[in-house]
Amino acid sequence: MPMSLRVATLLALLLFVVACGAKQTNEESESEECVTEQTMLVAELEEGKTCEVIADFGVVTHRAIVEMPIRVVNATDEPIVLVDYSTTCRCTMLDLDRAPIEAGGECEIVLTFDSRGEWGGVGNFLDITTSNPECGFVIWMGATVE
């Protein structure tokens, strides 16, 4: 997929994030290589909707492994479990807490991107399976590896 199409797709999906209720808060994050300010993404799971989150890692140094926490909020009336996920690339991983998220509760998951073997614009898709088939959850991940 041409890079301009990837960028256009990520920008278009950013508009969908607003519609599903994803919110952002600023938090500081430390890694072994540097200290950076990072945006904490919030995914709000609602019955009858698919929550789409765009996780933009920005510029990533080649061979770096970077993480982004995502707060998942259960806005339904029933407990939800994040059962499993599928991804378009093995360089993108998700650390799921498979404990039930109570109604109105929240948990934190961690999205990891391993840039080893990647160059230039990278865009991946993660589809998270929940215990409620009426609550969809997807993550669009982007990074530029230099």
Identify the function of each model-found stretch.
Residues 27-75, 142-145:
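Beta-sheet-dominated interaction scaffolds and their linkers
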Residues 17-19:
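C-terminal motif of bacterial Sec signal peptides marking the signal peptidase cleavage site
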Residues 68-74, 109-111, 124-129, 140-141:
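Buried hydrophobic-core signal for structured, non-transmembrane domains
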Residues 25-29, 119-145:
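Terminal connector regions
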Residues 21-23:
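Bacterial signal peptide processing site
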Residues 62-69, 116-125:
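Short, solvent-exposed loop/turn segments enriched in Ser/Thr/Gly
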Residues 77-105:
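Surface-exposed binding patches on compact interaction domains or structured appendages
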Residues 75-78, 117, 132:
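Short, acidic/polar linear motifs in exposed loop/turn regions
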